[in-house]
């Protein structure tokens, strides 16, 4: 990278950047319409998180961050999920800063154990296999300022991957329905059709998380408990997309 690596200090000003993008040391750029296809690992020297920036954000931008916070709860802490869910559904309610720092702590716990993303850190990818495919496709068919946001794409991905979790990882029907209900608003606000499996498959096959020719997922066993290194068939992924499509 430039000058063999530069020291960097980050001051995230969006909720998504505070709870996710600024920590963990991953950098990435989109390439040939694939999400984060080129990147490296480089930790910031310092990260200054100031929640006072948040009142300047539109609600759509806040929702992007809430989705990643919901994900942190879904994979590791049910009580955190329940607390964030309240704020996500009550968009005019001020966000408790302690929830921001707890989300950061959940991510850091995974990163510290597995900086290079070869094991437990993969659990942070819940929702992102489908989410990145949806986001990449949207970038192709839409102008950049009209394309599906990262938070919305990951939220939709979490619906599909929760369905897959119910088929492969033992997620209960009650948990699946609860997650779906919380994320229903994202589905309702989507201003484009859910792409077919044929359209999404090239993006899924190029996902950087894959091992050999298999499409790799991190899946929920229950709310607050996630495991990594599942693979799903094309047929099952298509079922998950149908499940999402029927919610619109």
List each model region and its residues.
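C-terminal charged capping/lid subdomain of soluble metabolic enzymes
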Residues: 67-69, 171-248
């Amino acid at each position: 990278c430039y000058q063999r690596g530069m020291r960097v200090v980050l001051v995230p000003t969006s909720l998504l950047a505070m709870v996710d993008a600024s920590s963990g040391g991953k950098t990435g750029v989109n390439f040939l319409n694939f999400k984060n296809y080129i990147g490296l690992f480089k930790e910031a020297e310092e990260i200054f998180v100031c929640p006072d920036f948040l009142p300047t954000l539109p609600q759509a931008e806040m929702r992007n961050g809430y989705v990643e916070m919901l994900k942190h709860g879904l994979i590791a802490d049910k009580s955190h999920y329940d607390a964030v869910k309240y704020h996500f559904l009550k968009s005019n309610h001020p966000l408790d800063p302690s929830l921001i720092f707890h989300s950061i702590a959940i991510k850091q716990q995974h990163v510290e154990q597995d900086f290079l993303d070869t094991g437990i850190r993969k659990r942070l990818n819940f929702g992102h296999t489908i989410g990145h495919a949806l986001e990449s496709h949207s970038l192709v068919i839409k102008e950049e300022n009209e394309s599906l946001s990262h938070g919305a794409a990951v939220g939709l991905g979490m619906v599909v991957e929760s369905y897959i979790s119910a088929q492969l990882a033992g997620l209960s029907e009650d948990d699946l329905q609860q997650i779906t209900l919380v994320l229903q608003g994202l589905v309702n606000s989507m201003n484009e059709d859910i792409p077919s499996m044929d359209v999404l498959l090239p993006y899924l096959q190029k996902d950087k998380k894959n091992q050999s020719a298999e499409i790799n997922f991190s899946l929920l066993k229950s709310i607050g408990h996630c495991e990594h290194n599942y693979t799903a068939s094309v047929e099952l992924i298509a079922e998950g997309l149908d499940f999402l499509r029927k919610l619109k």
